[in-house]
């Protein structure tokens, strides 16, 4: 084959991409991505040599003559090993399969580790040496980022993840550009300065605050602006519910991003309902195209074989869909704890590609007390690493701040957490607007009767099953149900109706899972909350007398305890309940700062250090040969796998247009973002029952559509088996 005629990809319409063009294009992108954390040469080399196995005659026969499949990714890894660059060897070997386990010198060629793959390549003796006609010989990189020297292995493994993300995203983007013949609609986002100006112009329309509550919110806002001038690092924003954290934290993020040249703002939030509301607020202020709302996850890797060849025409359908996976390239991202932290510890390419875009960002961890206890230490370690070595600023933003400073202080030289609003006691006193009381409830029927005595009332349950069963006991005008079995656009419509009825003084009785308890802007005169962790109870209390229009003693949050066998309640739900009961015995005011501190201190003490990293993630990453694949499998904030189901709506033109595109095989990032508004997450066992009863239509590569209209209730959403009823939200 003549020099310059080596092919990297082919398209469905017969076009060919020269291999050298793909290598150079990927190299330029990966170099730019890695320069954010002072590793441009590492990114450049990863991109330039990642596909040199395609120079082999065997691969060229594969792509031009439909020959047998060829492993083309191990060749570049072997070349990197020869210059003693193991991180690049691992990234290149893994760029299709996902991050491999490192392995050891004793690894077998069949075990799937990097060392095993390299042995296999040596035995196979695939000749790709003609790469020298178009590429220079690689030379050792003399300089690594300073933060890697003299550190433990966690720094090293995190650096590998960042490099891998740079390579995978660059590879996907360059391939996407070719597949779409250069017609890729990317970028076009507003600059951070433009977003800054949009926000402050919007905020100026509020005028001078006239009520005591709005004056206090203005004080908090100003403290956030003042703190934004401070050096990047770790901050906390401890403000009770109703203090205006959402806009104040955005003001901090925008001003800080301008001053310190941060490339994006990422909000990390525990509940989809808060994500939906927060993203709506930001889109209204900053423009729809500048904000990505990312929570549902379509996993194309489930159907992506580790020996997959992305270069043949018959594979282009799957390839296009993988290319459409989210990479967080917008200036403002609103996502979940699950998406954020599982991506940081992921192995699959579609989840890892976004990780490098976290670097040099302002990270707002809303409701930081919801960080999952079984993974608290690895989550904190990764947050600390992003702040210490990847130019991030992080804000722990909550109404009930857990005691996390101790854990951050153990990272490296120690990260100091700076409180933006230091008068915590004063703020708790000012924003106290409800009275908590405990009550006995012997049945859902009794509870329903209690709720019917109120014209406007909110009741929050611990499980989707109880929420649905209780709702079905309620009758009459103005009764509403909320849970994540309702697709996001459905929940938005119901919340809009609820807000309007509350404003108009009409009957409004709402039964909800805990999705409503934090960050959702509603104001009820009376609230009922099933007993839960103290932070959850106080969050729910924030939906009562939010604007201070009633006397505190008249605004009752009733905490009820339904009789249930404790051995049937999962430990992660039971433990916070028991600690709440302990704290309530010792503290007359369960919502005081002292009570909250006592609750979190006891919770973390009860769990113990080991249970704050229940899968030994940190220990396994602090060894010389980390097992990336196994760690990714074990790092699951939601233990049970979930699937997403698209809900067709006959009278919704946007919904039908999206569905038609999905059925025709059209799939890009824009379509997936729109489709998210009509998707419902279900656990694997619930998914199987829908599948077994022929209620689903399987589209390509992991997408499913509900086909039975009766399986989606217009009031309560997707009808599935409710036996596993504890409410967990993606």
Label each region the model flagged.
Residues 231-253:
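Walker A/P-loop
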Residues 1-201:
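Accessory nucleic-acid engagement/destabilization modules that flank
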Residues 88, 387, 446-454, 460, ...:
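C-terminal helicase lobe and adjacent C-terminal extensions/tails of nucleic-acid helicase motors
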Residues 399-452:
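Interdomain hinge/linker at the junction between the two RecA-like core domains of SF2 helicases
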Residues 287-345:
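Inter-Walker segment of RecA-like/P-loop motor cores
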Residues 262-286, 295-298, 403:
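Conserved Walker A/P-loop ATP-binding site and its immediately adjacent core
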Residues 337-341, 349-389:
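SF2 helicase catalytic motif II
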Residues 8-13, 272, 292-304, 462-465, ...:
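Conserved helicase motor
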């Amino acid at each position: 084959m003549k020099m310059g005629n080596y092919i990297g990809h082919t398209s469905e319409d017969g076009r060919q991409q020269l291999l050298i063009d793909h290598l150079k294009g990927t190299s330029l992108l990966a170099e730019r991505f890695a320069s954010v954390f002072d590793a441009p040469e590492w990114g450049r080399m990863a991109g330039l040599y990642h596909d040199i196995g395609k120079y082999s005659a065997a691969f060229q026969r594969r792509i031009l003559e439909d020959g047998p499949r060829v492993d083309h990714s191990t060749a570049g890894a072997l070349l990197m090993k020869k210059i003693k660059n193991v991180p690049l060897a691992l990234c290149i070997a893994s760029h299709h399969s996902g991050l491999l386990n490192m392995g050891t010198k004793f690894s077998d060629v069949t075990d799937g580790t990097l060392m095993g793959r390299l042995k296999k390549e040596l035995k196979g003796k695939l000749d790709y040496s003609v790469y020298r006609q178009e590429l220079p010989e690689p030379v050792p990189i003399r300089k690594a980022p300073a933060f890697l020297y003299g550190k433990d292995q966690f720094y090293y493994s995190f650096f590998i993840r960042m490099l891998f993300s740079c390579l995978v995203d660059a590879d996907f983007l360059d391939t996407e550009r070719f597949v779409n013949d250069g017609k890729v609609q990317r970028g076009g986002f507003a600059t951070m300065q433009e977003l800054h100006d949009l926000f402050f112009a919007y905020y100026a329309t509020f005028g001078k605050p006239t009520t005591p509550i709005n004056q206090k919110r203005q004080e908090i806002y100003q403290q956030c602006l003042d703190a934004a001038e401070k050096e990047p690092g770790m901050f906390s924003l401890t403000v009770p519910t109703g203090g205006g954290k959402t806009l104040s934290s955005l003001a901090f993020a925008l001003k800080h991003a301008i001053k310190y040249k941060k490339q994006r703002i990422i909000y990390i939030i525990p509940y989809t309902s808060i994500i939906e509301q927060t993203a709506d607020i930001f889109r209204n202020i900053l423009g729809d195209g500048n904000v990505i709302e990312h929570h549902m996850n379509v996993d194309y890797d489930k159907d992506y074989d580790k020996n997959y060849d992305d270069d043949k025409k018959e594979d282009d359908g799957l390839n296009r869909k993988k290319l459409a996976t989210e990479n967080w390239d917008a200036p403002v991202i609103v996502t979940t704890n699950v998406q954020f932290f599982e991506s940081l510890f992921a192995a699959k390419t579609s989840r890892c590609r976004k990780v490098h875009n976290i670097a040099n960002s302002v990270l707002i961890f809303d409701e930081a007390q919801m960080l999952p206890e079984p993974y608290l230490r690895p989550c904190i370690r990764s947050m600390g690493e992003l702040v210490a070595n990847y130019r991030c600023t992080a804000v722990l933003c909550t109404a009930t701040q857990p005691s996390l400073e101790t854990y951050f202080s153990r990272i490296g030289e120690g990260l100091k957490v700076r409180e933006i609003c230091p008068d915590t006691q004063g703020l708790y006193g000012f924003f106290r607007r409800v009275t908590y009381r405990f009550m006995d409830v012997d049945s859902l029927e009794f509870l329903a009767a209690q709720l019917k005595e109120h014209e406007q009332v909110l009741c929050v349950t611990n499980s989707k099953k109880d929420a649905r069963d209780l709702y079905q006991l309620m009758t009459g005008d103005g009764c509403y149900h909320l849970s994540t079995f309702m697709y996001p656009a459905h929940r938005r419509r119901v919340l809009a109706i609820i807000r309007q009825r509350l404003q108009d003084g009409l009957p409004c009785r709402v039964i909800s899972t805990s999705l409503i308890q934090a960050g959702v802007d509603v104001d009820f005169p009376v609230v009922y909350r099933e007993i839960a962790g103290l932070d959850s109870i106080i969050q729910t209390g924030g939906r009562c007398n939010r604007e201070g229009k009633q006397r505190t003693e008249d605004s009752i949050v009733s905490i009820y305890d339904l009789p249930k066998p404790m051995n049937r309640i999962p430990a992660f739900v039971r433990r916070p309940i028991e600690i709440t009961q302990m704290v309530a015995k010792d503290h007359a005011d369960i919502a005081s700062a002292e009570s909250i501190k006592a609750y979190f201190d006891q919770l973390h003490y009860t769990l113990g250090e080991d249970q704050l990293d229940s899968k030994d993630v940190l220990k396994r990453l602090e060894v010389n040969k980390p097992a990336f694949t196994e760690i990714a499998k074990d790092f699951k904030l939601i233990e049970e796998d979930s699937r997403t189901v698209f809900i067709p709506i006959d009278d919704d033109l946007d919904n039908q247009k999206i569905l038609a595109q999905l059925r025709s095989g059209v799939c890009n990032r824009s379509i997936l973002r729109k489709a998210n508004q009509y998707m419902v997450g279900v656990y694997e066992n619930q998914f199987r029952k829908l599948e077994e009863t022929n209620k689903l239509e399987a589209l390509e590569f992991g997408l499913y559509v509900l086909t039975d209209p009766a399986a989606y209730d217009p009031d309560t959403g997707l009808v599935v088996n409710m036996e596993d009823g504890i409410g967990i939200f993606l």
